[in-house]
Amino acid sequence: MRILIANDDGVTAPGIAALYDALADHADCVVIAPDQDKSGASSSLTLERPLHPQRLDNGFISLNGTPTDCVHLGLNGLLEELPDMVVSGINLGANLGDDVLYSGTVAAAIEGRFLKGPAFAFSLVSRLTDNLPTAMHFARLLVSAHERLAVPPRTVLNVNIPNLPLDRVRGIQLTRLGHRARAAAPVKVVNPRGKEGYWIAAAGDAEDGGPGTDFHAVMQGYVSITPLQLDRTFHEAFGGLDEWLGGLT
């Protein structure tokens, strides 16, 4: 099995090295990742300048682009052999609920949707590395068992691992995405020359985080697995829209 590994924290981030170490004994792994932190890049592509891959001493490929650029380039010409699946992470920080709309970690996995295997996005619910071994364990466990998984084509599995030692994790739960409340207001700053600027503030707290959600699972000490689909069509709105459009003609 051949796996393309990517992330959004950057090619030198500890999480991607941990993911490679977790999977390299079970698969032929190649790493293509951004040359700097691209958290929050979502599915953006770089279109205004060329991309320049650079192979590092450890064999990883660094790219001056986004997480989606990395996977897109890997699947469309940079790699001589097409991988079987894309695995993204291990992100240091949660990708729960609405986070998936902004996450470069999830976006990198989504870009691997055309491959025959399901794509995985792994996130440790912490900015610290103490419990990276826990995330490594579950990444190895889930990816190595993917061939027994029967899911529709183009399924992306968003996996969040609680910030706990392995012996304190209570198990794995299948979940839906929760929802966050509105984010905090951007923080206004003024530089010494009087020019105003803004820092994006923290994401909102869980507004819909009850039982069955990814938020609830990790808070209770479980690994959360949420299957994501790419059809963003809001089918339940069709009836109201049909009636509305009928009144316009």
From Swiss-Prot:
Q: Where are the transmembrane segments?
A: none
What is the organism field in this record?
A: Pseudomonas aeruginosa (strain LESB58)
What does the cofactor section's free text say about binding?
Answer: Binds 1 divalent metal cation per subunit.
Q: Which reaction does it catalyse?
A: a ribonucleoside 5'-phosphate + H2O = a ribonucleoside + phosphate
Please give the family membership noted in the entry.
Belongs to the SurE nucleotidase family.
GO MF annotation list:
3'-nucleotidase activity; 5'-nucleotidase activity; exopolyphosphatase activity; metal ion binding; nucleotide binding
InterPro entries, per the entry: SurE, SurE-like_Pase/nucleotidase, SurE-like_sf
Query: Key word Glycoprotein present in the record?
Result: no
Q: Name one Pfam family in it.
A: SurE
- UniProt KW Nucleotide-binding keyword: yes
Q: Write out the GO cellular component annotations.
A: cytoplasm
What cofactors does this protein use? Answer: a divalent metal cation
Protein known as: 5'-nucleotidase SurE
EC numbers on record: 3.1.3.5
Q: Which residues does a divalent metal cation bind?
A: D8, D9, S39, N91
> What role does it play?
Nucleotidase that shows phosphatase activity on nucleoside 5'-monophosphates.
Cellular location(s): Cytoplasm
Keywords tagged on the record: Cytoplasm, Hydrolase, Metal-binding, Nucleotide-binding
User: What is the enzyme's class at the highest EC level?
Assistant: hydrolase
